[in-house]
């Protein structure tokens, strides 16, 4: 019996030594594990940090074994700093993901959190300039530039030098139409009007110039033709393929879409039935009627 146990023990030891010949065994050795970057509990925040405008966020992870450790701090996936302490002043309304990677020759540790600003968009107005949203605080008389990017992980509206944008505020949303000749990029954006958070975007059509909101779900987009668009999914269908100014500044009243078909200062106002526009199929736009 003792001989059997001895044989099994030798076999197990042999298997153990054989396994330790693998390249990965060095990393699994207890002596090396003790040298891994170990962050002391409570020195890196796990919950999102909210700061006032003008404050500075500082985070210094404390290591059990800080020797020869290197740091990389990433804000929204882009390296921001390689210092042991992360320091970020909140100059602009912002919302960001933060990643900290600490390495030494034995391994690395990666930690993530997020931070945002406590800001008030109720005392001022948004405007688009240089291809992005800016905010002017009428109380503080301060302009906060590029708020759209700082609140949406660096996203942009992708506007070129010769592009322009129209903004329609409805249903608690900003509907942004990019007038551009580029056909293979997003032209239509949906942004929350209170937070400026991106919600959706789609390729709709080049040279978008106007939007008529028919109800909470549907609208008509004017550009190289008329498209009915689902404002939630952004699925759209062309109901008229000719360029028309009549829907550029139209309005909806009592179920009727009032238009100026000739786009002249003095012309007879006509109307389209809103329900007919909502239900019409591809290239089957109803005809306008005279207002009685």
Please describe what each predicted stretch is:
Residues 74-88:
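Surface-exposed, flexible coil segments in extracellular/virion-facing regions
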Residues 65-71:
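Solvent-exposed loop segments of extracellular immunoglobulin-like
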Residues 54-63:
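A short beta-strand segment in extracellular, disulfide-stabilized domains
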Residues 2, 13-48, 106-125:
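Bacterial Sec-dependent N-terminal signal peptides
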Residues 283-288:
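Conserved small/polar residues in nucleotide/adenosyl-binding loops
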Residues 116-140:
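An edge-strand/N-cap motif at the start of beta-rich repeat modules
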Residues 144-158, 197-203, 235-241, 277-282:
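A short beta-strand motif characteristic of beta-propeller blades
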């Amino acid at each position: 019996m003792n001989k059997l146990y001895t044989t099994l023990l030798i076999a197990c030891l042999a298997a153990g030594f054989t396994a330790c010949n693998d390249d990965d065994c060095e990393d699994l050795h207890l002596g090396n594990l003790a040298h891994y970057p170990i962050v002391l509990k409570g020195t890196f925040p796990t919950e999102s940090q909210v700061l006032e405008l003008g404050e500075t966020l500082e985070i210094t992870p404390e290591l059990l074994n800080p020797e020869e450790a290197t740091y990389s701090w990433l804000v929204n996936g882009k390296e921001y700093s390689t210092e042991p302490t992360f320091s970020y002043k909140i100059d602009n309304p912002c919302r960001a993901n933060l990643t900290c990677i600490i390495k030494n020759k034995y391994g690395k540790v990666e930690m993530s959190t997020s931070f945002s600003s406590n800001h008030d968009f109720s005392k001022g107005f948004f405007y688009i300039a240089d291809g992005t949203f800016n905010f002017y605080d009428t109380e503080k008389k301060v302009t906060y530039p590029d708020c759209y990017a700082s609140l949406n992980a660096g996203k942009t509206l992708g506007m070129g030098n010769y592009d322009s944008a129209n903004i329609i505020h409805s249903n608690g949303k900003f509907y942004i139409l990019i007038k551009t000749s580029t056909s293979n990029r997003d032209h239509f954006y949906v942004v929350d009007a209170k937070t400026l958070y991106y919600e959706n975007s789609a390729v709709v059509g080049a040279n978008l110039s106007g939007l008529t909101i028919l109800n909470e779900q549907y609208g008509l987009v004017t550009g190289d033709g008329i498209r009915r668009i689902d404002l939630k999914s952004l699925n759209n269908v062309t109901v008229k393929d000719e360029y028309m100014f009549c829907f550029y500044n139209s309005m909806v009243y009592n179920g009727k879409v009032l238009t100026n078909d000739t786009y002249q200062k003095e012309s007879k106002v006509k109307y389209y039935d809103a329900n007919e526009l909502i239900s019409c199929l591809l290239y089957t736009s109803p005809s306008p009627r005279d207002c009685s």
